[in-house]
């Protein structure tokens, strides 16, 4: 798969997405507000998440391609809505940076000069609506997101509450919450491919683990709107509240220089260690 296609699928993983599955069940015993409250409790608590101002993930993407089956990535997030995403494939490097208002993308190819481009209008809209650190449900009122209960489905054999999240922009997302664990099973949104017709992008959240008392999915599987199969983002390590300068999320200037993550060793493919390793699966 090309870096362009991988980038689209990987970033779709960091923005909640998915398609409805199953039929509506009987009337739900819980309200949307109660489901959201139980979700926050299951993930470690609302106040605990409010204390997280920055986060760094490192791991790899399983592409399913024999050419580059595993591609290392580092994803940095800082409130209120700053992100930096870096992929490395052999001698190629792709970086996407969003400072909360504007975004840029840089690609360095083998033997070629780095190319810097601004985000497209569609990419900007997507980045501005991302809820990277804690997702759509946690602290949704502070984010201006309205949550409503839309029914009950079965997702991969598990009963799930289907919620509709309406963002400030008016765009909608669907979120399926496990009726037993109250963790997210999948989400969806409408997305445009290279064609003119929109499609539904689906993201499944798997292998939830406790990291410093907070629950996070460590496998995020994305199925793109064009239906060209799926990819898995596997999060191997997470750092909570690292020191991240705002310069990490500014317009890249020195395109030829690799900046190591603050406080971490610079690592090549296959060695993306961060100081905090995930605990056993819960």
Residue ranges and their predicted role:
Residues 54, 136-149, 197-203:
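A short, amphipathic edge element
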Residues 104-134:
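Acidic/charged, solvent-exposed loop-and-adjacent secondary-structure segments enriched in E/D, K/R, S/T
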Residues 1-10:
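Bacterial N-terminal signal peptides that target proteins for export
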Residues 22-28, 39, 255, 259-282:
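Compositionally biased, proline/threonine/alanine/serine-rich low-complexity intrinsically disordered stretches
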Residues 13-22:
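Hydrophobic h-region of N-terminal signal peptides that target proteins for export
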Residues 26, 33-111, 144-149, 154:
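N-terminal mature ectodomain segment of secretory-pathway/periplasmic proteins
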Residues 22, 90-92, 152, 156-255:
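Gly/Pro-enriched, hydrophobic low-complexity segments
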Residues 99-100, 169, 271:
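Acidic/polar residues in short coil/turn loops that connect beta-strands
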């Amino acid at each position: 798969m090309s870096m362009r296609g991988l980038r689209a699928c990987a970033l779709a993983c960091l923005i909640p997405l998915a398609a409805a599955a199953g039929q509506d069940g009987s009337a739900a015993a819980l309200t949307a507000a109660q489901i959201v409250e139980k979700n926050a409790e299951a993930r470690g608590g609302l106040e605990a998440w409010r204390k997280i101002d920055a986060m760094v993930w490192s791991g790899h993407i399983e592409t399913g391609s024999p050419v580059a089956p595993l591609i290392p990535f580092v994803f940095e997030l800082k409130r209120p809505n700053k992100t930096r995403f870096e992929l490395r494939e052999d001698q190629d490097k792709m970086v996407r940076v969003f400072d909360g208002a504007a975004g840029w993308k840089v690609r360095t190819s083998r033997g070629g000069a780095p190319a810097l481009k601004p985000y497209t209008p569609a990419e900007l809209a997507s980045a501005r609506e991302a809820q990277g650190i804690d997702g759509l449900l946690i602290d949704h009122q502070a984010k201006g997101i309205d949550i409503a209960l839309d029914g009950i489905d079965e997702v991969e054999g598990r009963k799930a509450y289907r919620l509709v999240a309406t963002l400030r922009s008016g765009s909608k997302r669907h979120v399926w919450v496990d009726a037993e664990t109250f963790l997210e099973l999948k989400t969806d949104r409408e997305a445009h491919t290279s064609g003119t017709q929109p499609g539904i992008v689906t993201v499944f959240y798997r292998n939830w683990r406790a990291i410093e008392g907070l629950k996070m999915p460590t496998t995020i599987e994305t199925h793109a709107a064009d239906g060209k199969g799926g990819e898995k983002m596997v999060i191997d390590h997470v750092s909570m509240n690292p020191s991240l300068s705002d310069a990490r999320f500014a317009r890249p200037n020195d395109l030829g220089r690799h900046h190591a993550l603050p406080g971490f060793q610079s690592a090549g493919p296959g060695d993306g260690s961060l100081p905090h390793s995930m605990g056993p699966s819960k």
